[in-house]
C-alpha cells in the first residue's frame, strides 16, 4: 500500500462561498437545552441511540465541569425530557460521555477519566434514561477517549487510549497506545485486550525515532456487516525529544473484525491482533504529512472521519495552512490498489459523516467562531459538493449522528462554550433532523 504526499490543488471549495449554496435537504433544529454545554474533547463516536422498542431517542452531552447529562425524546409525544445529570466529569474536558445500549435494554455511559481510569454508568431501568444511574469502575488503566460499540451478538467493546507513564512512572510521556475492553454480559464483567490476545496493546508503537508514539483515533465506525473502520493520526515530541502532543503526523487507516479481533489494511492484509509501527508504516499509511505546526495548528487535527462506499473506504481530515490561510480540508480515497488524496475545501472543521445511500455520504462541518452547521455530500467516495446550511443560534463544537436514528432526532450538535474552562458552560444543545411527515 502506498501513501500519497500532499500536493496543493489550484481550485478548492471555499467554506464562505458554500454557505449560500442550498441543497434539497430540509433540516429542522430543536434546542433541547440552553446555555448548558461546556467545552468538550468528545470524538464523533457514540453520542446517542434510538431505541425502537419504546420509540425513544436517547442522547448524551457534557455540561458544566464536564459532568455527563442525558436526555430522551419521545417520538410518539414529540417531546424532550429535561436534562438528567448522571455522572461527574471531574472538571476535565477529556471526561466526556459516550453512550451505547446493551442487549438487555440498559443504557450505558462510558467516561475515560483523563489518564486515570475507565468508568461506566448504567441506567437503573432498561429502555429509559430516568433516575439515578449506577456507576462502575471498569479498570484503573490510565484510560482516555473511550470509543464503545456493541456487536450483533451483544458483545460490548470499548477502545481507549492508555497513558503508560501514569501506570509505571518510567515510560516516556509520549508513548500512548490504544487498547480495548470487552464484555459479553451487558457490561457486568470485563476483560482487557491483553487478557484476550496476550498483546501489550492493540494499536501503537514504543520506539519511533521521531518519538511519535501516541495514537489519536479520529473516528471509529461500526458498519452493518460488523466491520469496525478506524482512522487515526500520530502525536508525540518529535526529534527534539519526548513531549506529549508537541506534533501530529500522518493519516492511517485500518479496520477491525470483532469476531477474531484481527486488524486489516484497506487491501485486506491480515495484521493479526496487534498493529505495531512496522505494520502501520508498511500497510496502513494513507497520507504522509510534515512534522511541523502549520499556522501553529497541530496537523492533522485530532478529529477525522471514515466511511465506505461499496466496501471501499474514504477519509476526511484537515490541517493548518503554512501560509497562514484557512484550514485545508482533504479527502483520501482507496481506489482498490492505493490511496488518492486531494484537497476539497478550505476553512472547515469536518465534524461527522452520515451515510445517505449506497453511493453518498453527508458531511457535517463548522467554521471557527461562526454559528450554523454546513453540510456537504461525498459521492462515490470521491466527489465533494455543497449541500445546505443548518442554522444554529450559536457556534457548534461537536456533532454526532445518533445510532439507528429516527427523524427528527438525527444529529446531536453540542454548542461551543465561550471559555475553555469547563466551569463555564454556556453552549446550547441542538438536535437536527428531517421533519417526519
Protein language model annotation of sequence segments:
Residues 20-437:
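Extracellular, repeat-based ectodomains that mediate carbohydrate processing or recognition
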Residues 1-19:
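Secretory targeting and sorting signals
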Amino acid at each position: 500500500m502506498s501513501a500519497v504526499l500532499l500536493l496543493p490543488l489550484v481550485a478548492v471549495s471555499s467554506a464562505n462561498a458554500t454557505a449560500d449554496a442550498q441543497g434539497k435537504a430540509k433540516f429542522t433544529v430543536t434546542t433541547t437545552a440552553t446555555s448548558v454545554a461546556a467545552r468538550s474533547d468528545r470524538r464523533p463516536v457514540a453520542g446517542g441511540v434510538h431505541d425502537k422498542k419504546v420509540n425513544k431517542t436517547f442522547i448524551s452531552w457534557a455540561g458544566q465541569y464536564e459532568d455527563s447529562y442525558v436526555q430522551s425524546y419521545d417520538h410518539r409525544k414529540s417531546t424532550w425530557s429535561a436534562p438528567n445529570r448522571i455522572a461527574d466529569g471531574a472538571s476535565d474536558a477529556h471526561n466526556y460521555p459516550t453512550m451505547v445500549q446493551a442487549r438487555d435494554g440498559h443504557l450505558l455511559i462510558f467516561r475515560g477519566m483523563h489518564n486515570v481510569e475507565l468508568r461506566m454508568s448504567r441506567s437503573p431501568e432498561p429502555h429509559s434514561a430516568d433516575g439515578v444511574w449506577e456507576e462502575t469502575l471498569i479498570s484503573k488503566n490510565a484510560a482516555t477517549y473511550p470509543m464503545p460499540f456493541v456487536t450483533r451478538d451483544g458483545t460490548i467493546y470499548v477502545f481507549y487510549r492508555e497513558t503508560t507513564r501514569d501506570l509505571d512512572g518510567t515510560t516516556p510521556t509520549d508513548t500512548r497506545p490504544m487498547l480495548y475492553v470487552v464484555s459479553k454480559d451487558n457490561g457486568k464483567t470485563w476483560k482487557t485486550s491483553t487478557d484476550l490476545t496476550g498483546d501489550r496493546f492493540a494499536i501503537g508503537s514504543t520506539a519511533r525515532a521521531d518519538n511519535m508514539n501516541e495514537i489519536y483515533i479520529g473516528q471509529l465506525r461500526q458498519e452493518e456487516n460488523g466491520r469496525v473502520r478506524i482512522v487515526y493520526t500520530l502525536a508525540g515530541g518529535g526529534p527534539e525529544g519526548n513531549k506529549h502532543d508537541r506534533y501530529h503526523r500522518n493519516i492511517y487507516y485500518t479496520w477491525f473484525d470483532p469476531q477474531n479481533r484481527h486488524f486489516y489494511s484497506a487491501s485486506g492484509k491480515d495484521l493479526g491482533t496487534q498493529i505495531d509501527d512496522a505494520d502501520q508504516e508498511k500497510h496502513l499509511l494513507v497520507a504522509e504529512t510534515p512534522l511541523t505546526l502549520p499556522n501553529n495548528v497541530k496537523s492533522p487535527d485530532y478529529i477525522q472521519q471514515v466511511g465506505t462506499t461499496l466496501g471501499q473506504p474514504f477519509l476526511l481530515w484537515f490541517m493548518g495552512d503554512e501560509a497562514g490561510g484557512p484550514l485545508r480540508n482533504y479527502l483520501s480515497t482507496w481506489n482498490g490498489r492505493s490511496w488518492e488524496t486531494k484537497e476539497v475545501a478550505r476553512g472547515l472543521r469536518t465534524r461527522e459523516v452520515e451515510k445517505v445511500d449506497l453511493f453518498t455520504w453527508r458531511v457535517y462541518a463548522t467554521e471557527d467562531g461562526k454559528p450554523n452547521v454546513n453540510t456537504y455530500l461525498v459521492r462515490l467516495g470521491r466527489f465533494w459538493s455543497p449541500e445546505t446550511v443548518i442554522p444554529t443560534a450559536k457556534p457548534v463544537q461537536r456533532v454526532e449522528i445518533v445510532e439507528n436514528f429516527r427523524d427528527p432526532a438525527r444529529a446531536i450538535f453540542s454548542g461551543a462554550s465561550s471559555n475553555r474552562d469547563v466551569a463555564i458552560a454556556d453552549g446550547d444543545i441542538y438536535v437536527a433532523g428531517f421533519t417526519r411527515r
